Amino acid sequence: MIKIKLKLESQIFEIIMSTASLKRDHALIEKVLKSMWSTIPLLKSGKTIPEPILNQVIDFSMNFTDVCHHGKEENSLFPELEKKGMPRNSGPIAVMLMEHEVTRKIATRMETSSKTYLKNGDATQLIVDMQEYINHVVQHLWKENNRLFEMAEMALRNDVEQVNKSLQDVEDTKLKELGKTREDYERFADEFTKQYPPQD
């Protein structure tokens, strides 16, 4: 009985850990999204979002969320799931890849509209792009947390150590290429949240 219990507890622990790195990314991304949402009423009322802050929001969206986090999924998690028989061109992986591409396109538009805003003070398109970006990413993260990751945790429960190492290797490589550290983005998220607290 004890051995079975310990074995089950070990399996449960492994299941939790197989996507822990990605869930940690999600928590950081959601933290930034909430403060991004808090800037929208300010922009609508004509208040100014300082250029350094807005530039960091764009950097986080395009580099941490896309290059780093999506990179971990596309170069590590998804290939591992393919090895377990989950197809790349249909089903959950195909949907996530499509949504990643949508995220990139909206982020690129948001970068362009942020430059327009910083140049002439017109926040009209920036507000539209930020709202679309936040709504899209929030829904995407929910699907991953509550659908894809549950399947991944079951499929990869016997390969946790390998998956964790692969995810960490991709994160380290992507951040090094960006000339950033995870701590840089965590620090930004903390500072951004203090300046623009999430709305209730």
Language-model features: locations:
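Small-residue-biased structural context
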Residues: 2-200
